[in-house]
Amino acid sequence: MVDQNPKRSGEPPVWLMFGAGGTVSAIFLPVVILIIGLLLPFGLVDAHNLITFAYSWIGKLVILVLTIFPMWCGLHRIHHGMHDLKVHVPAGGFIFYGLATIYTVWVLFAVINL
């Protein structure tokens, strides 16, 4: 018999943020490291152009994506890694996902006020 009122989990939105963070980290952060770590110091990219891009709406969106999603991924990994190591933090999900939410709100305010 199939349960007509299945218990819903709160995990799918968290897994969405975790997956997005892993994807962003793997695909886009190497490009950011290349631009900021190599091209900018060697003068191949003008700093004024980067600053102008950061102040545009698409630049703000890029900053949001490159900062928020990897943080969710990292805190999700720490939360589940501690569980795998048998270190059970009381209300661990609330703590780690709460920190990610606070960070998200903080970054949103910071980037919007650029």
UniProtKB/Swiss-Prot annotation:
Species: Haemophilus influenzae (strain 86-028NP)
A molecular function GO annotation: succinate dehydrogenase activity
Gene Ontology cellular component annotations, sorted alphabetically: fumarate reductase complex; plasma membrane
Protein name (database record): Fumarate reductase subunit D
GO biological process: fumarate metabolic process
Family, similarity comment: Belongs to the FrdD family.
UniProt lineage: Bacteria, Pseudomonadati, Pseudomonadota, Gammaproteobacteria, Pasteurellales
Transmembrane feature ranges: 24-44, 50-70, 92-112
Record has Cell membrane as a keyword: yes
InterPro entries: Fumarate_red_D (IPR003418), SQR/QFR_C/D (IPR034804)
